[in-house]
Amino acid sequence: MQGAAAWLHANTEAGTMIFQLDWDDFPYLFFHNTQNAYLVGLDPTYLQLASPDLWNLWVSITQGRVEQPSGFILNTYGAPYVVGDRQHDAFADQAANDPNMQIVYLDQYSIIWRVNTSD
């Protein structure tokens, strides 16, 4: 996650919301990049209690149960980037079939997609 955090720091503006695929990636991301805002950090229960609908949608997206996830990620969560480790095959399959999801960073541990606006 260190490489992904460094890429985000170098290529995004301060305060940019980042949609991460696992809440437990937050400590690594935040340690290496404090300039961005992260959707879920420290404990996912905070989002679950504060906004059950957003929580349930986040879970569905991260588990690859939402087709064309870009619209929800950008319009519902305000996140122009998605970051995750390389173990989210179901989400990666959905992202690969979404014309508005573009891989902008990839290493052996992590992947970042840019969420493009619809044409």
Language-model features, listed with the residues they occupy:
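Extracytoplasmic
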Residues: 1-119
